[in-house]
A protein has these predicted regions:
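Class II aminoacyl-tRNA synthetase catalytic cores and aaRS-like
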Residues: 1-590
Length: 590
């Protein structure tokens, strides 16, 4: 760089700086030789500034400018002037830099794809050349904004008496939850660490260590099959508080959301958020993370069909089941029979045996079931669903009300997405509360903790933890935004006797509980304050704030569907000596 040192960033200059001498540096986004005058767009982490080389430019500098190509790295000095032909395509479109000194710091080969936002690029190619993809403004900005979001989070917690504490990332593997990533110990042959799925146990022990309020922006790892919104390694905004109630935790976190949305998006979020019990969320929306930006709410029409002679419904009701419905109001012209058949496939994917329908059009009603109903049943159904000409009624029956509602909930979402019922500019927050404490695993043949084994049961359910696990609810809460679970938490058990009962309800022997969680159980013996906390997926939070379609867009180097990282080639085979040092022998399946 010689004696040149940056004095300004490209994206931060304006008309207020016109007439100033300055030095800027970055990469050439593109260069255009107009014959006697050369324009070049210089890009740095803040934005783009147009460089100008003309007849007044020193000859040696102009000669260098003639060699400029895309992605050459340069530093240059010159005078900032007001542009004659202004543009609103870039933030600095009112000014340009007339260059008097230029140094080419690094040349560049032709890139495998153009680094412009308007160019569609194959995802595999983008991930292979992630460092190039991140130079594009639309891919660069989310990482910068993510950093600002993290700064606000840290500032907010520090302002509210939290202490930032780092917990270990080489920990003991414990049961429950997803599969652990394991790390072999070289110094203790045959022993393994696990990478943390969350700092859960350590943050609870911090409360038992006298730290009143803790937070951490933590790296976490889960060896599970990937979905669109999941990564094997992810970042979690983690928090825990002592001497608080569920209400206190919600208030603190509503304040965090309020500050983030105001400082990042200049949006005033209204608090407190709606609190919706889990049973209500499932019953009305068919989801424990309901999207409340649109209607199409699920209705319970079981009473309408009491005594029905329509055999499919009658059989379900005889078995103690339920019939649920939604009214796709005014969509009869858009939901053809073919469309409804596709919705039926959606319902079946989520466990429904079928999707009954009625299309109410000006030409009459077409239905898969109405001819089997009495006039009284039809009238009662129409009244219950406020049905009128132009509507489509969709019904699911099942012996399991959760399954029926879940299937209709997915149908509801499919209709809304395909028919423009969702306002993309809305941010609808709510709390889902009073989750079931347990869920039964047919595969395991036992009750499992819906969240984790340390979740506090509701006071009215304490006597039922072992005798009737399915009837127990938890002091647990999820914060939901636009149909996405952004974070969740609970109050924790701080009574050793209750924790022992919880372990027994989950099928743990005393020996197994002590083997897995003995260090936590020992800590409880020395006095444990009431405590609770929350955790957010930072990647998902940033994705929602910036309205991105995938968390890959807000992670610098994301993994793909097979948990690989295309740019570096991870994971990879390792040297035989490394395996020998770790006392590991491989037995690979063909």
């Amino acid at each position: 760089m010689g004696n040149l040192r940056r004095t300004n960033y490209c994206g931060e200059v304006s008309l207020a700086n016109a007439g100033q001498e300055m030095t800027v540096c970055g990469s050439i986004a593109r260069a255009r030789d107009k014959g006697g005058i050369i324009f070049a767009d210089l890009r740095d982490t803040t934005g783009i500034l147009q460089l100008v080389f003309d007849e007044d430019t020193p000859k040696d500098v102009f000669a260098k400018a003639e060699s400029l190509k895309s992605e050459y790295v340069v530093i240059c000095r010159g005078k900032l002037r007001e542009r004659a032909a202004k543009t609103d395509k870039i933030a600095t479109g009112d000014v340009e830099l007339y260059v008097s000194e230029l140094r080419i710091l690094s040349e560049a080969q032709t890139t495998p794809f153009e680094l412009r936002d308007e160019i569609n690029v194959n995802d595999d190619l983008r991930l292979r050349y992630r460092y190039l993809d991140r130079r594009r403004p639309s891919m660069h900005a989310p990482i910068v904004l993510r950093s600002k979001i993290m700064q606000i989070i840290r500032s907010y917690f520090c302002d509210n008496h939290f202490t930032e504490i780092e917990t270990p990332t080489l920990i003991k593997s414990t049961p429950e939850g997803a599969r652990d990533y394991l790390v072999p110990s070289r110094v203790q042959p045959g022993h393994f660490y696990a990478l943390p799925q969350s700092p859960q146990l350590y943050k609870q022990i911090l409360m038992l260590s006298g730290f009143d309020r803790y937070f951490q922006i933590a790296r976490c790892y889960r060896d599970e099959d990937l979905r669109a919104d999941r990564q094997p390694e992810f970042t979690q905004v983690d928090e825990e508080m002592s001497f608080v109630s569920e209400d206190d935790i919600m208030t603190i976190n509503e304040g965090l959301i309020k500050r983030l949305w105001k400082e990042m998006l200049n949006i005033d979020v209204q608090t407190p958020f709606v609190r919706m019990p889990w049973d209500e969320a499932m019953g009305r929306f068919g989801s424990d993370k309901p999207d409340t930006r649109f209607g199409l709410e699920i209705q319970n029409v079981t009473e309408v069909f009491k005594g029905t002679e329509f055999k499919p419904f009658a059989a379900v009701l005889e078995a103690g089941g339920t019939i649920r419905a939604i009214n796709a109001k005014g969509l009869a012209d858009k939901l053809s029979r073919k469309n409804i058949d596709k919705l039926g496939e959606v319902a079946k994917t989520y466990g429904a045996k079928g999707l009954a329908y009625s299309r109410l059009t000006a030409d009459g009603t077409s239905s898969s079931f109405e001819k089997f109903l009495s006039d009284a049943e039809k009238a009662a159904l129409y009244a219950a669903l406020n049905a009128e000409t132009g509507d489509v009624l969709l019904l699911v029956s099942d012996t399991d009300w959760v399954k029926a509602c879940t299937a209709l909930g997915q149908v509801r979402l499919d209709i809304a997405r395909k028919h423009g019922l969702i306002d993309p500019d809305k941010f609808n927050f709510l709390w889902v509360v009073d989750f079931p404490l347990f869920e039964y695993s047919e595969q395991e043949g036992r009750w499992m903790a819906m969240h984790h084994p340390f979740t506090l049961p509701k006071a009215e359910d304490l006597d039922k933890v072992e005798s009737d696990p399915g009837a127990c609810h938890a002091v647990a809460y999820d914060i939901v935004l636009n149909g996405v679970e952004m974070g969740g938490g609970s109050m924790r058990i701080n009574d050793p006797a209750l924790q022992d009962r919880m372990f027994r309800a989950l099928g743990f022997t005393e020996e197994k509980a002590r083997e897995s969680f003995g260090f936590l159980m020992d800590a409880y013996k020395f006095g444990a304050p009431p405590h609770g906390g929350m955790a957010y997926g930072l990647d998902r939070m940033v994705m929602l704030m910036l309205k991105k379609d995938s968390i890959r867009d807000v992670i610098a180097f994301p993994k793909v569907q097979n948990a690989g990282e295309p740019m570096s080639g991870a994971p990879d085979v390792v040297d035989a000596q490394q395996l020998k040092d770790l006392n590991i022998a491989l037995t690979l399946k063909d």
